[in-house]
From Swiss-Prot:
Belongs to the eIF-2B gamma/epsilon subunits family. It comes from the Eukaryota. One of its GO terms (biological process) is regulation of translational initiation. It comes from Saccharomyces cerevisiae (strain ATCC 204508 / S288c). Pfam families: Hexapep_GlmU. InterPro entries: eIF2B_gamma, GlmU/GlgC-like_hexapep, Nucleotide-diphossugar_trans, Trimer_LpxA-like_sf. Present with 9530 molecules/cell in log phase SD medium. This is Translation initiation factor eIF2B subunit gamma. CDD domains: eIF-2B_gamma_N (cd04198), LbH_eIF2B_gamma_C (cd04652). Disulfide bonds: none annotated.
């Protein structure tokens, strides 16, 4: 089964002040006016199309695209692309906003070059062995710019023409130890009438770094309604999703009586998190198409004069063509075709209108509601909950971002021949990742931390459980505990920071103590810069004014804070309570 993979790169609304939706990349040169993001980006991309473009961009900008935020000194999207290479997908495409796609492509240049060299080494090693028939070239990675305002709109208007078979939608921010074959096999074994399979997981990490972040995560919980179908041979299916805010507003969880009538043994969970991984069948494209194609499909589905229902024949894949000729004695299937689903049958889709001008999480919520809202059942959406023994992290908020880095550090500390390192009387723990270009002065201590390139650590510093972006400068006797320091930031001597987030290019004056604060730059209308201490809710854009706008639709794939309070769209069959 050949599957196309689409990796969505969002803005990262919950990763501020290191990245934030609709935040213009500003330069830090006070002698001139701030350059626009497009001009500066084009200048850097055209001047250096390699990995150094990121470091050079950090010297002028305070924030980065989310896909290029480092996890273990590697852009987070590289872990997703490595995972896709293990799955052997038919095609890999990276979808990002049009103002970030060039920088993301440039930031992955060194990764793509190394990836090609690795495949060449494997080719040389296996060319003379009995496994030469397994040799293949690395899948090309396409970069697709998106001008859509939401991920659902991007899928409907920009990606549907590129899809020619089953496909999977992935985020750019997950780190996991689950082999992709586990999810692919689960998708292959889905029920005949399932249009897609969503992946959910339980948060197994007990992070206690930032209490404010934990409180925000509790407010952003969701009530996930699903059925395990224990009394039948069917696979579990997703039924509905409700937001914590909506339930709090109405003071009770409202579940439709029609849903309870069809699924009396449903389960409601607040511990499940959406992974933003959707394995979709090609039949789903028939529901999501719009415009003249949708009108023609609706016309062919029902005769306006006679009212007779007519058979809808959606485009078929190669495997479907082989199954269609099972009764043909003269038909000879291809010798190389693999047909793991011999008894699959096509679904007679009822082409209900689907509104895709929203995030994909809402689109699949509407598709799950579609399966039971109508008097005639529709095709359901499957759900697969990852086992507790596995580890899955989505770095879509600051707490999870730190957990992802600690997961990589834990793997590094457990590898063989790993030991503590002494550099000029400075102690570097086995659970730390330090770039070779870092400068660490005497009597400093680094434990369970990640230090980016060209970081400068003063003498007698103590860095524990922290993440330092490239170009960070620490004075003497600085203490950092569970902090994230943005690129080119400067921390004065004898400062003590605990559970703090420092934006890039920010300067902390000497002898300051902060705990649980977010320090960010503020750009005034006159292009003047000032420095203030912001509360996390202000930085993350969770003010009441921001909630009333639709500016965060594009970043819904980055977080699970999108609202699920849209009105129901259903066929009035008289079974709903009023």
């Amino acid at each position: 089964m050949s599957i196309q993979a689409f990796v969505f790169c969002g803005k990262g609304s919950n990763l501020a002040p290191f990245t934030q939706p609709d935040f213009p990349f500003q330069t830090q040169n006070k002698d001139s006016t701030a350059a626009t993001s497009g001009d500066k980006l084009n200048e850097l991309v055209n001047s250096a199309l390699d990995s150094t473009v990121i470091n050079e961009f950090m010297q002028h900008s305070t924030r980065l695209p989310k896909a290029l935020l480092p996890i273990g000194n590697r852009p987070m999207i590289e872990y997703v692309l490595d995972w896709c290479d293990q799955a052997d997908f038919k095609e890999i495409s990276v979808v990002a906003p049009v103002d970030e796609i060039e920088l993301i492509e440039s930031g992955l240049t060194s990764f793509l070059s190394l990836r090609k060299q690795q495949f060449e080494l494997i080719y040389k090693a296996l060319s003379n062995s009995n496994h030469s028939h397994h040799l293949q070239d690395p899948k090309k990675i396409n970069f697709i710019p998106s001008k859509a305002n939401s991920t659902g709109e991007s899928l409907q208007k920009e990606l549907l023409p590129r899809i020619n078979g089953d496909f999977v939608i992935l985020p750019c921010d997950f780190v996991t130890d689950i082999p992709p074959q586990v999810l692919v096999d689960q998708f292959r074994n889905r029920d005949d009438n399932n249009l897609a399979m969503t992946i959910y997981y339980k948060n197994s990490l007990d992070s206690s770094i930032d209490k404010k972040q934990q409180q925000k995560q509790k407010q952003q919980q969701f009530f996930t309604v699903y059925s395990e179908n224990e009394d039948s041979e069917r696979q579990p299916i997703l039924l509905d999703v409700y937001s914590q805010r909506d339930v709090t507003k109405t003071k009770y969880l409202q579940i439709r009586s029609h849903l309870l009538w069809n699924y009396p043994n449903l389960t409601v969970s607040t511990k499940l998190l959406n992974s933003f991984i959707y394995f979709c069948s090609f039949e789903l494209c028939q529901l999501l198409k719009l415009g003249p194609q949708s009108m023609s499909r609706q016309a062919s589905f029902k005769d306006p004069f006679t009212g007779n229902q007519q058979q809808q024949n959606p485009p078929t894949t190669d495997d479907d063509e082989d199954r269609n000729h099972d009764d043909d004695d003269d038909y000879k299937p291809s010798a190389t075709s693999i047909q793991p689903t011999y008894f699959k049958k096509k679904n007679d889709l009822i082409l209900d209108p689907i509104n895709c001008n929203k995030s994909l999480s809402k689109v699949f919520r509407d598709l799950s509601r579609r399966s039971w809202q109508h008097s005639k059942p529709r095709e359901p959406i499957g759900i697969f909950i990852l086992p507790n023994e596995t580890l899955f992290i989505r770095a879509n908020n600051l707490n999870a971002y730190m957990d992802a880095n600690r997961f990589v550090l834990k793997i590094k500390s457990q590898t063989m021949f790993t030991k503590n390192i002494q550099i000029q009387s400075a102690a570097i723990g086995a659970d730390a990742i330090v770039d070779p270009k870092c400068q660490i002065s005497a009597h400093s201590n680094v434990k369970m931390s990640v230090l980016g390139t060209q970081a400068n650590i003063g003498s007698r510093c103590r860095v524990a459980g922290s993440l330092l972006f490239p170009g960070v400068h620490l004075g003497d006797e600085v203490i950092l505990e569970n902090c994230i320091i943005g690129p080119m930031a400067k921390i004065g001597s004898k400062c003590k920071l605990s559970n703090c987030y420092i934006e890039g290019h920010y300067v902390v004056e000497p002898k300051n103590n902060f705990k649980g604060e977010t320090l960010a730059n503020v750009y005034l209308d006159e292009d003047e810069e000032d420095e203030l201490i912001y509360d996390d809710s202000v930085i993350a854009g969770e003010s009441e004014i921001a909630e009333e706008t639709d500016s965060d639709d594009r970043s819904d794939e980055d977080s699970d804070d999108s609202e699920y309070t849209d009105e129901y769209e259903y066929e009035d069959d008289g079974l709903f309570e009023r």
